[in-house]
Amino acid sequence: MACGEFSLIARYFDRVRSSRLDVELGIGDDCALLNIPEKQTLAISTDTLVAGNHFLPDIDPADLAYKALAVNLSDLAAMGADPAWLTLALTLPDVDEAWLESFSDSLFDLLNYYDMQLIGGDTTRGPLSMTLGIHGFVPMGRALTRSGAKPGDWIYVTGTPGDSAAGLAILQNRLQVADAKDADYLIKRHLRPSPRILQGQALRDLANSAIDLSDGLISDLGHIVKASDCGARIDLALLPFSDALSRHVEPEQALRWALSGGEDYELCFTVPELNRGALDVALGHLGVPFTCIGQMTADIEGLCFIRDGEPVTLDWKGYDHFATP
């Protein structure tokens, strides 16, 4: 049976979450009507994902829905925000009901996990792409930003950057991993990244700055450096690698992927010396490793990478949509 735009929305995307009392009116009218809780600041982020650019054209729709939402959740995590609402503008080449069912089921599984509600959006015909607008709340005056780092702050990352780039390389047959368990782990790190929502919330009163690693550590830490007007010194020997990555990738390639591979969606953040003990307590029970990799400083500009005690020059760069190939 043919499925028009409005029946498509009703069948696959109009799923009300009654637990969200801040939504007066969701899908079905010209606008959503929403209430911002008292003493909360609204945090908003938007991402566009295009087939062949941000994801492989033959990706499983369940993985696509998960990743599309997860990367937006990662932006909220970087600000220390609580997830609340989502808008979705979806462009489809045709109506494939099996594809839509898999996509929407996966999307709502993750929405429900974070007690979020889809409040509106749009559908149209064209090459496969989507734009998501995510909304969350952060207590007034407690949001994490890129601009708060101070000289002397210690620089940390969660998880093990570089895994996502390795997973993509496996999917593109650029990396051969014979161990099925390791291959599955790395592919999952690319297709289904874990937004560090709890870590971001725990950092509200501990970190001076934070950012999520979407374009690679070089690029993203560079944003903190620029916004905070101070330098950063990184000890390459301190960068954490997963066992799966270390077993199948040469050290220099692992380092390159960790610094410039992108799409890890871990958090990079800076913490003053005074808060390091509290940081261990706040993040230590959340089940995700976090590693100190360097220090912010006033005596250099930009990023300085140290190997065996000496500065080294790296010509790697993070991902840039408009960079000249």
UniProtKB/Swiss-Prot annotation:
Binding site for Mg(2+) 1: 46-47, 122
Record-listed Mg(2+) 4 binding positions: 30, 45, 75
Reactions catalysed, as given in the entry: thiamine phosphate + ATP = thiamine diphosphate + ADP
Signal sequence region: none
UniProt-annotated binding residues for Mg(2+) 5: 215
Alphabetic keyword roster: ATP-binding, Kinase, Magnesium, Metal-binding, Nucleotide-binding, Thiamine biosynthesis, Transferase
Binding site for substrate: 54, 263, 319
Described purpose of this protein according to its UniProt entry: Catalyzes the ATP-dependent phosphorylation of thiamine-monophosphate (TMP) to form thiamine-pyrophosphate (TPP), the active form of vitamin B1. Cannot use thiamine as substrate. Is highly specific for ATP as phosphate donor.
Protein name, as recorded: Thiamine-monophosphate kinase
Taxonomic source organism: Escherichia coli (strain K12)
Taxonomic lineage: Bacteria, Pseudomonadati, Pseudomonadota, Gammaproteobacteria, Enterobacterales
